[in-house]
Regions:
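Structured functional modules or segments
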Residues: 635-709
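Short, low-complexity intrinsically disordered segments enriched in A/P/G/S/L with frequent Arg
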Residues: 8-12, 405
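Structured, non-catalytic alpha/beta "coupling" segments that mediate domain-domain communication
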Residues: 107-114, 356, 366, 591-622
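N-terminal beta-alpha lobe that positions the nucleotide/phosphoryl donor
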Residues: 15-294, 298-317, 323
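Conserved nucleotide-binding/hydrolysis modules and their immediate coupling elements
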Residues: 327, 558-563, 568-585, 589-596, ...
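Long, charged amphipathic helices and adjacent flexible linkers at domain junctions
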Residues: 343-351, 491-493, 497, 531-532, ...
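Catalytic cores of soluble metabolic enzymes centered on carboxylation/carboxyl-transfer
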Residues: 279, 318-573, 667, 701-707
Length: 709
């Protein structure tokens, strides 16, 4: 146990209402949400206690808290979700209240009950509300009784896969198979036929048992072309309840949200009001008191149907905070302390637009499979306060006088909620999300442009990550137009993400910037080349830049302010910037517009990453370019007759054996990583010649599971 540090001194112990406020709260969670809660508690003058497993001994949330208590091994079922261990930490530290964050014990009524029995406040809703809404079968019945629109489905208990197939066929495909106690995309499968229903039932049941300790499954009709829109509610213990607008969460992968925004580009004020009033009605029906979220699916005609109510703080809560100026964590603490809401429904104004991008430790080039390892480089973009949160004095941990980075527009805000740091480890034991990057702007276009620039400025090395994919989405026509559904990723990237190709104008801007950067590097090389006086190495002005299958001849005319790049076809670009050789981030300006490039060194040029593109850029003299065209490129090894493990994980099941004939799409093996089961399927008809791995084996990336003839 680590004791209180200097940050624990001189904290006030009263609320804004004059009531006595908690002196110390414990956060029963880890990662970015634990850090987020600590920030608001610190602002309120409340001391904080972190809990940590073996894997999190050096984690950021442990360093930020005033005290920290070790609670066990890395596995969550031996540490973070063991109620007795959290209760021991409370007794050791004298914490008066507990914030559960999200996941883990946040929606476990037994945990709320244990806290109540110990006289410790739960910074969340009453046990009864958690029980009622935590069971998806019960919650759907209650929602219907409260006048909330619901999706048709089967709410009874399902005993086995064959019964699941029968029920699915009766409802009519497609269906959604869901864990009754589920959340976070775990224990959920869409089935389009009997075989998928059979497989989906078993996988959902397994994931539900391992993640929630409850393997009950229900099935409901899957609404095709749906949007996922949720309403944020906030209620106190005195019967007051309001809604804080909606969040659009339709950009999802395997039912896991990836990008969220507020407000939704699809809603109109009338529909927003209907959804908000239904959400409030449901909250009041279960005597809700805290922050909570009512999730809906919506079809193209704006018909909406209840999905579930999350009785906790949502991952994506920052976008609501950014457009309303309301600190939801602070409100949760005040409600738990017995305060009456100081905000009425008429006080809620939605100002501007906010977007959140979830940075995941996953490899988009390997179909978004989890990645683990050490963060050898982790440099988020500079945070900058703006908008309602700043106006209301509710922005946390960003100095009022914070200077915007060159790539930022000072009318937009940048916020990064994270739980990691450079040099830290990304573990296989927990959720792969490592940061939530948010931007706010007066309009959706402003927030989008702010996000594009912030993503380009975000430096991450050492693990696979989805930054390129997030950047690609920000420029995708369907996303920029707001014409999105929950099927967006599956529809637009059916074979996974293979990077993007920059359009011609963007490609020329990058080529011009690289030519200017190359001149800076050439001048440096000339100065340290060791040549004799009066025989210095000359830096020419004629260059060829090759990238993305194209090459451009150009002239570089440099001056003190930058360089003018003249292309052979007569087009010119004016380039300036502060890049020096060795910098891994180049903040350039091309024709008056910012251009942020991640820069790596390769032989004869640069590796450039920008706007979702990963480019190998070669800058050569005209003679070098002529010779390069004659050089053959090395081919990658042939792995087409092998099934490779796409991520570090555990082989849960082998579905075939040596000598088996397999068909395209047939399940070959199931690998579990980061609490998710991944079914690996045959890409084509083949015969299994050799099995190289067994059930229970732990595999690394690209380990050979089986071979084919």
């Amino acid at each position: 146990m680590r004791g209180p540090g200097d940050g624990a001194r001189n904290r006030r112990k009263y609320s804004d209402k004059g009531m006595e406020m908690f002196d110390k709260i414990l956060i029963a969670n880890r990662g970015e949400i634990a850090c987020r809660v600590i920030k608001s508690a610190r602002k309120m003058g409340i001391r904080t206690v972190a809990v940590y497993s073996d894997a999190d001994r050096n984690a950021l949330h442990v360093a930020m808290a005033d005290e920290a208590v070790h609670i066990g091994p890395a596995q969550a079922n031996q540490s973070y979700i063991v109620i007795d261990k959290i209760m021991d930490a409370i007794r050791q530290t004298g914490a008066q209240a507990v914030h559960p964050g999200y996941g883990f014990l946040s929606e476990n009524p037994k945990f709320a009950e244990a806290l109540d029995a110990a006289g410790v406040a739960f910074i969340g809703p009453p046990k009864g509300a958690i029980e009622a809404m935590g069971d998806k079968i019960t919650s759907k019945k209650l929602a219907s009784e409260a006048g909330v629109s619901t999706v048709p489905g089967y709410m009874g208990l399902i005993e086995d896969a064959e019964e699941a197939v029968k029920i699915s066929a009766e409802i009519g495909y497609p269906v959604m198979i869901k864990a009754s106690a589920g959340g976070g995309g775990k224990g959920m499968r869409i089935a389009w036929d009997d075989e998928e229903a059979r497989e989906g039932f078993q996988s959902s049941k397994n994931e539900a048992a391992s993640s929630f300790g409850d393997d009950r499954i229900f099935i409901e009709k899957f609404v095709t072309q749906p949007r996922h829109i949720e309403i944020q509610v906030l209620a106190d213990k005195h019967g007051n309840c309001i809604y804080l607008g909606e969040r659009e969460c339709s950009i999802q992968r395997r039912n896991q949200k990836v990008i969220e925004e507020a407000p939704s580009p699809f809603l109109d004020p009338e529909t927003r009001k209907k959804m908000g009033e239904q959400a409030v009605a449901l909250a009041k029906a279960v005597d809700y008191a805290s922050a909570g979220t009512v999730e809906f699916i919506m079809d193209g005609d704006k018909n909406f149907y209840f999905l579930e109510m999350n009785t906790r703080l949502q991952v994506e809560h920052p976008v609501t905070e950014l457009i309303t100026g309301i600190d939801l964590v602070e409100q949760m603490i005040r409600v738990a302390d017995g305060e009456t809401l100081s905000i009425a429904q008429d006080d809620v104004k939605l100002n501007g637009w906010a977007i959140e991008s979830r940075l995941y430790a996953e490899d988009p080039y390997r179909n978004f499979l989890p990645s683990i390892g050490r963060l050898t480089r982790y440099r988020p973009p500079s945070e900058h306060a703006a908008g309602p949160l700043e106006d209301n004095g509710k922005w946390v941990d960003v100095a009022d006088a914070a200077e915007a980075a060159p790539e930022q527009n000072t009318t937009t805000a940048v916020r990064n909620d994270t739980g990691v740091f450079e040099g830290g480890e990304i573990s296989m034991y927990y959720d792969p999300m490592i940061a939530k990057l948010c931007t706010w702007g007066p309009t959706r276009a402003d927030a989008l442009e702010g996000m594009r620039n912030a993503l380009d400025a975000f430096e991450v090395e050492g693990i696979g990550h989805n930054l390129p994919f997030l950047s690609a989405v920000m420029d995708h026509p369907r996303f920029t137009s707001g014409e999105i559904t929950t099927g967006f990723i599956a529809e637009e990237y059916p074979d996974g993400f293979a990077g993007v190709e920059l359009p011609e104008d963007a490609l020329r801007r990058v080529a011009a910037a690289c030519a200017a950067m190359n001149r800076v590097a050439e001048i440096r090389r000339a100065r340290i080349s060791g040549t004799l006086d009066n025989h210095e190495r000359k830096v020419g002005d004629q260059w060829n830049v090759a990238l993305q299958g194209q090459d451009f001849d150009m002239t570089v005319e440099a001056d003190r302010e930058g360089a003018t790049i003249r292309f052979a076809d007569g087009k010119t670009h004016r380039v300036s910037g502060d890049w020096t050789p060795g910098d891994q981030l180049a903040r350039m300006n091309v024709d008056g517009a910012p251009l942020v490039l991640k820069v790596g060194k390769i032989s004869g040029g640069f590796r450039i990453r920008s706007r979702g593109a990963d480019l190998r850029v070669h800058v050569r003299t005209p003679r070098q370019a002529e010779l390069a065209r004659l050089m053959p490129e090395k081919e990658a090894p042939d792995t087409s007759k092998m099934l490779l493990c796409p991520m570090p994980g555990l082989v849960v099941k082998l579905h075939v054996g040596e000598g088996d004939e397999v068909q395209e799409g047939q399940a070959l093996a199931t690998v579990e990583a980061m609490k998710m089961e991944n079914i690996l399927r045959a890409e084509r008809k083949a015969k299994v010649s050799k099995i190289n791995a067994g059930e229970g084996d732990s595999l690394a990336v690209d380990d050979v599971i089986m071979e084919f003839e």
